[in-house]
């Protein structure tokens, strides 16, 4: 989200604000060029701009110990709420989305296929429920990795 679909605003006489988060098309391991793994900082490219992500302001923020300490504190404050909300949202919407997902996959024949910039591992998920399980596992693994690496 720090390369695209992320905005910073500056209200008059106020601090910088992040948001709104725009979309999640590149989130949760869905784009191989942004590093589909849960165990890395996908927003940090090579400092010589040779990577797809390139040099961004986030590269520099993550080298600032004060920023990392504040980020760690904030993560610890919101982690469980965020993870539970994400997993709860998936569970809540899954029954409602299943009919549309089945129709979508029938029309577009995209199950078991890595489309566009998706990682090749998407070929392993041959049902909608497989993809839901992938998403849930990714979220849990990502949260655990952040716990250990922030």
Residue ranges and their predicted role:
Residues 1-150:
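Middle-to-C-terminal accessory/interaction subdomains
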């Amino acid at each position: 989200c720090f390369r695209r679909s992320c905005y910073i605003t500056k209200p008059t006489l106020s601090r910088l604000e992040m948001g709104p988060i725009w979309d999640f098309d590149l989130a949760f391991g869905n784009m191989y060029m942004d590093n589909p793994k849960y165990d890395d900082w996908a927003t940090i490219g090579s400092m010589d701009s040779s990577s797809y992500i390139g040099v961004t302001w986030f590269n520099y923020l993550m080298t600032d110990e004060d920023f990392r300490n504040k980020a760690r504190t904030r993560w610890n404050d919101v982690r469980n709420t965020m993870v539970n909300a994400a997993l709860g949202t998936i569970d809540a919407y899954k029954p409602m989305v299943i009919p549309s997902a089945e129709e979508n996959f029938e029309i577009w024949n995209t199950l078991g296929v890595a489309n566009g910039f998706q990682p090749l591992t998407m070929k392993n998920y041959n049902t909608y429920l497989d993809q839901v399980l992938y998403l849930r596992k990714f979220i849990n693994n990502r949260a655990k990795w952040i716990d250990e690496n922030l």
